[in-house]
Amino acid sequence: MTTHVPRASYTEEELSKLYPKELELQLVQILLRHGERTPVSPRFQNTGLPPYWPYCNAARQLSSVIMSTTDFTQWDQLKYRRRMETFGADDSPVIASGPSNEFDAVCQPGELTDKGRQTTLALGQRLRHLYVDQLQFMPQLIADSDSIYLRATPIPRALESVQQAFWGFYPPSARTADFPPPTIITRNPAEETLFPNDASCRRFGQLSRAFAQRCAERWNDSEDMQYLSNLFSKYMPDQAKVAVDSRPRLSGVMDTINATDAHGPATKLPKHFYDPKARAIIDKIAVDEWFSGYKESAEYRMLGVGALLGDITSRMAGSVEGNGRDGLLEIGERPHSSSDGGRGRGGETGIKLALSGCHDTTLAAALSSLGAFEGENWPPFTSHIAFELFKSKSASASKTPSHPSTPPSPSLTQSTLPSSQSWWSSLFGRAASPTQSPSSSSNTTPSSIARKPLSSLSPSERATLDGYYVRIRYNDRIMQIPACKAAGKHLEGDKSFCTLEAFKAVVDKVTPKNWKQACNSRLDEPAFPEKIEVPGYE
């Protein structure tokens, strides 16, 4: 399946079961895959598939921020339209055109298309219907975005998708006239953990290549691959056989099939490419190549998605403490500061909603690392995961928020670890954030339990987690974490509600203390563990 087909809205009966009265929703974190896009590189032009697609009308109405005075006091916008230039027959420059000689609205490789904008906008509208209209979790009208965390990877389609989803969740009619610009968090690509970053994490690059090679050895000479070659070889360069590591790779073939399937008749491949059996084979092998590492190797999970899962869980823990400092940390504010850092900043009471624009590899990696991706297909465009944090109304009535009086100890580095500690324990388990440094003077001290592994919590800190539950929904389907099925690890009568303590214990096992250090460790060690390390358990 290329495009996610959403289910109908939950009925009142379904809502009463999904959101029981004894629980109160406290925090929602959404990971959303970008919407439909063009292929990341042109392929199969020998079939007549145009290299340039006319599905990006945003290119007709782009704008850039312009400094209009030399004293930095005035800023404006330059509106413009984009056209693509390419090589002509004799290498002279020509304007690229679509299949019907369109010059405007022509897409770049991997660009979010009009349909991708449409489906991510619709996702935001569906989320609004659930969390605003049906559950009254978020307000109908907002004056600022202080309780909302927006984040995206450096890839433009991810940023544009989260912008579209936010617009659907809170359209202009649901924002006050003086609504200030929302903050959207991004990272340097070398520090990006919102997708499995094999380009910047050397050890993860080694692991991913090793598992990809194993996949090639497993499938290249199989009957399934022969079936694909019988269909597609005549379109491959030099009529080569299709293989996991062919050129284009099998995952590249899938990329073009999925992108063409999601768009109009002018950009379609020959019908053989959409053969149902062939697509099922491609999906199965691609999932094996890209995601089997998460199901077999704790190190793979740690380097690929552990930092992200640690961020999600620490935000939950910060929300539980109830002091709002997790919100301040997310947008870079100082608590009790006289400066508000701009309109809509400085009065945070804690993040309630997080929207993160990411990728298919993010979603599958997160679910696989929690033991919740068994038997799943490749995530379609505009798929999403909702991590929902609940608190028991009976428990919350008997507890008050915890306000730690002493800061946590600094995180350990490799040089300060005792010599008897193994490399494994030195890399796992997120410690507290470092103390302030010249490069991060605006950092605030994290809340006491947000960045501490469960094993390091005191009895009183651990008790703070009591009465809180985590539930995961993937494309509106409830997903089950294996560790949460055990007695005492879930809400009585419903195994889909994992205790926050059990959820944190699972995530702690894959959360690196220092991701960059882990990425440059074990470079001479074998890629595969001695035995399969099953995910989703404490």
Task: Give the predicted meaning of each segment.
Residues 1-149, 153-354, 358-538:
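Signature for phosphate-centric chemistry
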